[in-house]
Regions:
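Catalytic binding pocket for nucleotide-activated donors in carbohydrate/polymer assembly enzymes
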Residues: 1-116, 121-125, 130, 134-142
Length: 142
């Protein structure tokens, strides 16, 4: 198992344990986000990336049934309103495609298998048993 994700949340801890080089990290870092948001315009990203535009339009062009309106709300949350694409999903899209392509290229190779083994050997910190034990010690003082 490897992680394909942005370098935030639990992925930071996973990379600390297993090494960033053993995972597939894409997108803006937490340190970059503030500067990006000062000039960020999602509509420019959409217009510059036809593949992204096609994917985004499937949310509202009838490709998928949307009786609840959830897909339209998702589309609007990334393209309009007070703070469109708040989580920089559109901004990170091109880098996601690049890194995912690399992952698919690497898949099954000896190097990829090594990354998986390193990750598997490093996940003890994230086990439910450890979490429950730590919680019991912290909360119940056992």
């Amino acid at each position: 198992t490897v992680t394909l994700g942005t370098l935030d949340g639990a992925n930071v801890e996973i990379c600390e344990e297993a090494g960033r080089e053993n995972n597939y990290i894409f997108g803006a870092t937490v340190d970059e986000v503030g500067a990006i948001k000062q000039y960020y315009c999602p509509s420019e990203i959409i217009e510059q990336n036809p593949r992204l535009k096609r994917a985004l339009m499937t949310l509202v062009d009838g490709t998928f049934r949307d009786d609840s309106g959830m897909l339209r709300k998702l589309f609007e949350s990334m393209t309009t309103g007070y703070e469109p694409d708040r989580y920089l999903v559109l901004y990170d899209f091109a880098d996601y495609i690049r890194v995912k392509t690399q992952l698919l290229y690497d898949f099954g190779s000896e190097e990829f298998n090594k990354k998986c083994l390193v990750n598997l050997a490093s996940v003890g910190k994230f086990s439910a048993d450890r979490s429950v034990t730590d919680y019991a010690k912290l909360i119940w003082k056992t």
